[in-house]
Swiss-Prot record:
Cross-referenced InterPro entries: ATP_synth_f6_mt, ATP_synth_f6_sf_mt
Location in the cell: Mitochondrion; Mitochondrion inner membrane
Organism: Pongo abelii
Residues with N6-succinyllysine modification: 93, 98
GO-annotated molecular function: proton transmembrane transporter activity
Gene name in the database record: ATP5PF
GO cellular component: mitochondrial inner membrane; proton-transporting ATP synthase complex
Organism placement in taxonomy: Eukaryota, Metazoa, Chordata, Craniata, Vertebrata
Protein name, per record: ATP synthase peripheral stalk subunit F6, mitochondrial
Protein's GO biological process: proton motive force-driven ATP synthesis
Length: 107
């Protein structure tokens, strides 16, 4: 009943129909179980990478050189920015400028 009243307005009807058409098109592709072999391999690799990343808790297949380089770069950043926490946004404090009042000589 409420939907019928809403669909009387052409603007709402057209917006909803476009939205539904777009979503139905996306879900039809997403739920298509018939994947070609290349696409299936790609999706399998993405899932494998995701599971590896979750188990390792960081970068996948990163050797000790990568960890050393990462620590070195983070150390450089901490030195450049005064040992600030890199995960938080810096707090800025702006002071209002102080203006001097200059009196105009009267002519």
């Amino acid at each position: 009943m409420i939907l019928q009243r809403l669909f009387r307005f052409s603007v709402i009807r057209s917006a909803v129909s476009v939205y539904l058409r777009r979503n139905i098109g996306v879900t039809a592709v997403a739920f298509n179980k018939e994947l070609d072999p290349i696409q299936k391999l790609f999706v399998d690799k993405i899932r494998e990478y995701k599971s590896k990343r979750q188990t390792s808790g960081g970068p996948v297949d990163a050797g000790p050189e990568y960890q050393q380089e990462l620590e070195k770069e983070l150390f450089k950043l901490k030195q450049m920015f005064g040992n600030a926490d890199m995960n938080t946004f810096p707090a800025f404090k702006f002071e209002d400028p102080k203006f001097e009042v200059i009196e105009k000589p009267q002519a």
